[in-house]
A protein has these predicted regions:
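Functionally critical transmembrane alpha-helices in membrane proteins and complexes, commonly lining
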Residues: 6-73, 93-97, 214
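Short helix-coil transition/hinge motifs at the ends and kinks of transmembrane helices
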Residues: 30-46, 74-79, 114-136, 232-239
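Membrane-interface helix-loop-helix regions
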Residues: 44, 98-170
Length: 245
């Protein structure tokens, strides 16, 4: 398992690099559509540096495999605990999110002091990134708190110029919705718990934006991979005695 996780860590590292490269290219280079007669090397450069969205999908699949798989394992072993699960997940998310919000505030305010119009969308067409005239940077307390509790793209915009914060909101709601749905269908769950789970799931599905829910389908692919690996292991254990001498 450790050998497999090393490969997953390498894959996550590569995906993170692809995301950074795409954001950097969007800031430094014109879009591919604006190029005139690009050569093969230029096309290759834009292809390799344009895989940021696909890399985020890889993150979602890996998250579904690791986090969703841990939920399945805990339920199967009878060791499931909402308290322990939420504590682990919230800690992992906030360790990244809180520093990101504070750094965004610091760098945005520093940048705003030197070029305020850039944070109002004046350079959007030039850099193909950042705030737009219709949606300028928002550093309000309400937006900060909304992002802290993963409500960006739902009730508040992403904080400041940190647009990639949308992905953390997606992750949080997938972490919450998946075990609720799973517990509904687990055998032995009390009827009262099933009803509460159904109500919570219905509220979340109604409340969450459609693009976020569609991303959840990608997240579930990772869960599916975990489940298939489990089935494969069970089949190997069942068939192994037939091949013993």
């Amino acid at each position: 398992m450790k050998h497999r996780l090393v490969h997953l860590d390498c894959l996550r590292g590569l995906a993170a690099l692809l995301v950074v490269v795409e954001h950097l290219r969007a800031f430094l280079f014109v879009p591919f559509a604006q190029l005139k007669a690009p050569g093969i090397l230029t096309k290759g450069f834009y292809l390799v540096t344009g895989l940021g969205h696909q890399a985020v999908m890889i993150f979602f699949v890996l998250s579904g495999f690791l986090v969703g798989g841990s939920v399945i394992t805990a339920l199967q072993a009878g060791k499931w605990s909402w308290r322990g699960y939420l504590l682990r997940r919230m800690t992992r998310l906030w360790v990244v999110l809180i520093p990101a919000l504070l750094l965004t505030l610091f760098w945005d305010k520093l940048g705003y002091a030197h070029a305020p119009t850039g944070y109002e969308g004046a350079y959007r067409e030039l850099y193909h990134s950042g705030p737009t005239p219709s949606i300028p940077s928002d550093w309000s307390i309400g937006t900060f708190l909304g992002n802290t509790f993963f409500l960006q793209t739902i009730l508040v915009p992403c904080f400041g110029t940190n647009g990639p914060l949308w992905s953390l909101a997606n992750e949080f709601w997938y972490y919450l919705l998946f075990p609720v749905l799973l517990i509904i269908f687990v055998s032995g769950t009390r009827i009262q718990v099933r009803i509460i789970g159904l109500l919570l799931a219905a509220c979340m599905i109604f409340f969450l934006p459609r693009p976020m829910l569609m991303g959840g389908v990608i997240w579930l692919l990772g869960v599916g991979v975990f489940y298939l690996i489990q089935i494969e292991k069970e089949l190997e254990q069942e068939t192994a005695p037939f091949f013993l001498p």
